Amino acid sequence: MEKSSSCESLGSQPAAARPPSVDSLSSASTSHSENSVHTKSASVVSSDSISTSADNFSPDLRVLRESNKLAEMEEPPLLPGENIKDMAKDVTYICPFTGAVRGTLTVTNYRLYFKSMERDPPFVLDASLGVINRVEKIGGASSRGENSYGLETVCKDIRNLRFAHKPEGRTRRSIFENLMKYAFPVSNNLPLFAFEYKEVFPENGWKLYDPLLEYRRQGIPNESWRITKINERYELCDTYPALLVVPANIPDEELKRVASFRSRGRIPVLSWIHPESQATITRCSQPMVGVSGKRSKEDEKYLQAIMDSNAQSHEIFIFDARPSVNAVANKAKGGGYESEDAYQNAELVFLDIHNIHVMRESLRKLKEIVYPNIEETHWLSNLESTHWLEHIKLILAGALRIADKVESGKTSVIVHCSDGWDRTAQLTSLAMLMLDGYYRTTRGFEVLVEKEWLSFGHRFQLRVGHGDKNHADADRSPVFLQFIDCVWQMTRQFPTAFEFNEYFLITILDHLYSCLFGTFLCNSEQQRGKENLPKRTVSLWSYINSQLEDFTNPLYGSYSNHVLYPVASMRHLELWVGYYIRWNPRMKPQEPIHNRYKELLAKRAELQKKVEELQREISNRSTSSSERASSPAQCVTPVQTVV
């Protein structure tokens, strides 16, 4: 049965707007933070938001706070809209790396915060509630043994966090209830924290992506392609964006008939066009051929129009992301794939990328071998058994085939999987990243995510499970994580071709789960419009673009006209240690890598300034030499002695 994709409950109780802070979110903390991964916006904020007002506390906590001055040192820094919901003292965090540490555990409507003053510097654990997958009780009131009674939170970002409570303290029940309430607000008919967060940034990230400007950058519309508003009210396809690019000679009435033959109405529409050959990447869902092998003249004519728009090739390639056996099995459900008999001059290629359930299981296996500890003696065989890198290889290899066919073959391609919102998004966005240097800039990459993932209906709400306690939901899958992993693999092979750094990619993934920003909420453009996210929430790009120096690759050189061909073989791929194993302190660099990036950027700027000064000096000397050469000189007549 099809699961409802509504996200109307995400902001069910919008908070009244608070006076926003205009201070930049800069870190002032020097405490040890073994498990903190938030961007500075999620960890430390301006003094305005670290208010000592009792307004930030539930009434039953005010007495506790006023009676214990030490609590002020143990409380978390609060974001605008954030308030404390519960606090438990004398809780022990069972750290899998450094051992048990005792401190104060605080639950707000945004985060789980643990701080111990027993260590110098203080030990801090800071995790957004959005990252929590499930909360489990450990032991009963009669449990014996040290630290055998408490809570364990299983997280979406690989971690498990375990806290021991004293049975006589009666704090476990209260913390558990508040975690279940605020970590899963959608299940409790409460708003996600993104609807409470009211920070103001210099740039509005919601305005970053303008589809008309992006298509104009690509040279659209032209004589072969037009922009249609047939989906302006999302009536043609409720998971597609309002503006679509389609063949110029196909009228809107025919688009409706094509939509009836494609799964969920997701017709082939243009994602990218080659600036020289006019070869295109179009994306769609599977055709509804069924076991009887149904055909659609309108769909066949439509694909012919796509092929005809490229004068340099008389064929078209259809890349089906699925394994062929899965595509055949989909016929029993009414779906299927394009028959080469029905579609003239079309070649069908299966890319053998597995479905969301296989990927979810692969990530589960990966978590088992990387957290908390790594078994060195069987590391390679254990990693191989997860098949994670094998899946990454197949996705990269598929995108590479698409990019090569467009660039070298000058041939238009059509990409789809079953519904066209998971594997299809991975393939089109990665191929476009290889082909177009614009998408390798920081803002260009943000546009790519907005365009190929958000506007074209990747189901972020269902795949991530924002605020939903149903952790066993079969719709959850690490599809977007795999895409970012593939991007990281490309940055390793082409370290100077990307304007952004690893910290940028990790920040995006952290806020995929955090629910601090509205960027990754809901399942479609239509739903985000209904929820009025641009007005009611802050965009992740607002935060990132306010401090680009943190996310800039110091080695970046402009490769805008270069096509990247990454090597998609197991020998050239590696596990992303900086993301999957970052919680292990033995795997961390002594200094945060983004600090090193800043130093390198400053050094590069200093050297560039010296180069410019030397160039000016050389230019001035050349000018002076030219002036002297052109000025009249005193003539000396040689004296000759004639013998």
From Swiss-Prot:
Keywords: Cell projection, Coiled coil, Cytoplasm, Endosome, Hydrolase, Lipid metabolism, Membrane, Phosphoprotein. Residues 205-580 form the Myotubularin phosphatase domain. It catalyses: a 1,2-diacyl-sn-glycero-3-phospho-(1D-myo-inositol-3,5-bisphosphate) + H2O = a 1,2-diacyl-sn-glycero-3-phospho-(1D-myo-inositol-5-phosphate) + phosphate; a 1,2-diacyl-sn-glycero-3-phospho-(1D-myo-inositol-3-phosphate) + H2O = a 1,2-diacyl-sn-glycero-3-phospho-(1D-myo-inositol) + phosphate; 1,2-dioctanoyl-sn-glycero-3-phospho-(1-D-myo-inositol-3-phosphate) + H2O = 1,2-dioctanoyl-sn-glycero-3-phospho-(1D-myo-inositol) + phosphate; 1,2-dioctanoyl-sn-glycero-3-phospho-(1D-myo-inositol-3,5-bisphosphate) + H2O = 1,2-dioctanoyl-sn-glycero-3-phospho-(1D-myo-inositol-5-phosphate) + phosphate. It comes from the Eukaryota. A 1,2-diacyl-sn-glycero-3-phospho-(1D-myo-inositol-3,5-bisphosphate) binds at residues 330, 355-356, 418-423, 459, 463. InterPro entries: GRAM, Myotubularin, Myotubularin-like_Pase_dom, PH-like_dom_sf, Prot-tyrosine_phosphatase-like, Tyr_Pase_AS, Tyr_Pase_cat, Tyr_Pase_dom. Residues 1-12, 23-40, 632-643 have a biased composition (Polar residues). Residues 68-139 form the GRAM domain. GO terms for biological process: phosphatidylinositol biosynthetic process; phosphatidylinositol dephosphorylation. A 1,2-diacyl-sn-glycero-3-phospho-(1D-myo-inositol-3-phosphate) binds at residues 330, 355-356, 418-423, 463. One of its GO terms (cellular component) is early endosome membrane. Residues 41-55, 620-631 have a biased composition (Low complexity). It is a peripheral membrane protein. Phosphorylation at Ser-58 decreases MTMR2 localization to endocytic vesicular structures. Residues 1-56, 615-643 are annotated as: Disordered. Homodimer (via coiled-coil domain). Heterotetramer consisting of one MTMR2 dimer and one SBF2/MTMR13 dimer; specifically in peripheral nerves stabilizes SBF2/MTMR13 at the membranes and increases MTMR2 catalytic activity towards phosphatidylinositol 3,5-bisphosphate and to a lesser extent towards phosphatidylinositol 3-phosphate. Heterodimer with SBF1/MTMR5; acts as an adapter for the phosphatase MTMR2 to regulate MTMR2 catalytic activity and subcellular location. Heterodimer with MTMR12. The coiled-coil domain mediates homodimerization. Also mediates interaction with SBF1/MTMR5. By mediating MTMR2 homodimerization, indirectly involved in SBF2/MTMR13 and MTMR2 heterotetramerization. The GRAM domain mediates binding to phosphatidylinositol 4-phosphate, phosphatidylinositol 5-phosphate, phosphatidylinositol 3,5-bisphosphate and phosphatidylinositol 3,4,5-trisphosphate. Belongs to the protein-tyrosine phosphatase family. Non-receptor class myotubularin subfamily. Regulates the level of these phosphoinositides critical for various biological processes including autophagy initiation and autophagosome maturation. This is Phosphatidylinositol-3,5-bisphosphate 3-phosphatase MTMR2. It comes from Pongo abelii (Sumatran orangutan). The gene is MTMR2.
